[in-house]
Design a protein with these regions (language model features):
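Active-site loop immediately N-terminal to the catalytic Tyr-X3-Lys motif
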Residues: 91, 138-144, 166-167, 208, ...
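Residue(s) in the substrate-gating loop at a strand-loop-helix junction
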Residues: 133
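Conserved glycine-rich cofactor-binding loop
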Residues: 16-17
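Alpha-helical segment proximal to the catalytic Tyr-Lys
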Residues: 118, 162-166, 229
């Protein structure tokens, strides 16, 4: 443990479980005051103050930041982690699914960021870190809707970094590979043989295992840290080499 984030205020969306929970814990354990925005409190209570928020609903986002303003007027770190998954090809996806996923993953991230900007401007070391995905840069089968949404997040990260660099607000993103999260666990549970399916999934990873949520959280914390004052517009892969390595079979 350290005090790297002592005195700083962080907001983490999707902090109830998975990567978001690991991010909230990391910030808390290293000195930050953390506010977790999510639909349900989940397991965040030891690490973050829970504020109900549905990032897919503009009214809910406004209400969440009104509640946040009762506790703090300054925000130092925003970790945009909340999102939803989707499987299937463009033939499989319905119009409703496209709109739902893009509304939450892309527009939701934009909603939260827009609500946070005025508070971030009051910080001496403001940072936004978006959770993207390897799906933004690698053609993954049966991930059309999800991949499109994460590709948009990557582009949004760069655009936001350009828009706010003169204000000193740094904007970066992480691209996790296949992470060991509740969402992946749910997908595996739907297989005929979940144990065999997990073993096969791990075997496809260059490191021979899935990326852990704390590993992604550490990368997010690195990008959010005031020590990285010259790092903005960066896309940091945390994928065990899945994107960049081509290993012999």
């Amino acid at each position: 443990m350290s005090e790297e984030f002592k005195g700083l205020v962080a907001v983490v969306t999707g902090a109830g479980s998975g990567i978001g929970l690991a991010v909230a814990q990391h910030f808390h354990d290293n000195g930050a005051k953390v506010y977790g925005l999510d639909l349900q409190e989940g397991s965040m209570s030891p690490y973050a103050h829970f504020i109900t928020c549905d990032i897919g609903n503009p009214t809910s986002v406004i209400a969440a930041f009104a509640e946040l303003a009762k506790h703090t007027q300054v925000l130092d770190i925003l970790a945009n982690n909340a999102g939803v998954g989707a499987t299937g090809t463009v033939e499989d996806a319905t119009e409703e699914e496209w709109l739902r996923v893009l509304n939450i993953n892309v527009v939701g991230t934009s909603r939260v960021s827009a609500a946070a900007i005025s508070m971030l401007r009051k910080s001496k070391s403001p940072a936004i870190v978006n959770t993207c995905s390897i799906a933004a840069t690698a053609g993954l089968p049966k991930r059309a809707v999800y991949s499109a949404s994460k590709g948009a997040i990557m582009s949004l990260t760069l655009a936001m970094a350009a828009d706010h660099v003169k204000e000193g607000i740094r904007v970066n993103c992480v691209n996790p590979g296949t992470a060991d999260t509740p969402w992946v666990a749910r997908l595996l549970s739907q297989a005929q043989d979940p144990v065999a399916e997990r073993a096969a999934l791990e075997a496809r990873q260059p490191l021979g295992r899935l990326v852990s949520a704390p590993e992604v959280a550490s990368a997010i914390a690195y990008l959010a840290s005031p020590r990285q004052a010259s790092t903005t517009g960066t896309i940091l892969a945390v994928d065990g080499g899945m994107q960049g390595l081509r290993l012999p079979k």
